[in-house]
Amino acid sequence: MKIETLKKAEEFKQGHLNLVQYFLKKGCKFTVKDLGSGAVSLANSSNYERIKKAINEYDTHLEIWKDDRLVSKVWIIPYNEGIDTIADYYVSKEIDDWSNKFEKTMEQLN
């Protein structure tokens, strides 16, 4: 198995990265805000590697946009004692759908 395949599989199991991959496939873009400084670290991006870097470095607000509509705004705390914390401020159906699919997949893997 290739190293790149293993990396993708590991990222798939991380909730915050899985969320980004899921919504990128749906044609969404992301804005990332650093909670510490309040600054926008990434705006209107669909570049997975740049989004991953921005949300892996610190606690962030992640805005998910589709066709100029705010799908949701989530609070991301990566690697919170080994478990990603994702809080959906908008309680959106789209995030609920992703969450249900992600939880079912993780149950099947364990």
Regions from the PLM with identified roles:
Residues 1-3, 106-110:
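Short intrinsically disordered terminal tails
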Residues 3-14, 18, 86-100:
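Alpha-helix boundary/N-cap detector
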Residues 10, 21-23, 39, 46, ...:
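Generic low-complexity, intrinsically disordered sequence content enriched
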Residues 10-32:
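Amphipathic alpha-helical segments
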Residues 101-105:
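Charged phosphate-binding loop/patch that engages nucleotide di/tri-phosphates or the phosphate backbone
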